[in-house]
Amino acid sequence: MKWCKRGYVLAAILALASATIQAADVTITVNGKVVAKPCTVSTTNATVDLGDLYSFSLMSAGAASAWHDVALELTNCPVGTSRVTASFSGAADSTGYYKNQGTAQNIQLELQDDSGNTLNTGATKTVQVDDSSQSAHFPLQVRALTVNGGATQGTIQAVISITYTYS
């Protein structure tokens, strides 16, 4: 009888041991990033008034309004943040420029940096952070244009969104 009980105990121990042998492996994956702390965005919203434009001056293909300046300012950039990249997005029309979402037809909006580079949707612009003031400055300009000519009377409106990344 003792042998029989020992056999059951031994069988139970082996059963438990084999259960632990068949346990599944567990993997813990840890992800993260070390990033630069963001600057304070001083220019949270900017409005550019193009004023009244005359349809007769926007009849021919390539005609455009005067440039209007707009500046994006970032301040309080932490030490260690050396560059700020702005990514531009907005509704584009078939010409690639920003689409006029107002009522005037055959009008597009063009955004450029101070070097004359066009910043259509999807474009990026990187500037250095000024070490002495811990700030970054994006001087930009915008205008209305008609790629194909034949602008009609109506309103002009576009929304351009900017997302910043820091390094």
Curated annotation (Swiss-Prot):
It is found in: Fimbrium. It comes from the Bacteria. InterPro entries: Adhesion_dom_fimbrial_sf, Adhesion_dom_sf, Bact_Fimbrial_Adh_Pro. Disulfide bonds join C39-C77. The keyword Disulfide bond applies. GO terms for cellular component: pilus; pilus tip. The keyword Signal applies. Belongs to the fimbrial protein family. Involved in regulation of length and mediation of adhesion of type 1 fimbriae (but not necessary for the production of fimbriae). Involved in the integration of FimH in the fimbriae. This is Protein FimG. It comes from Escherichia coli (strain K12). The gene is fimG.
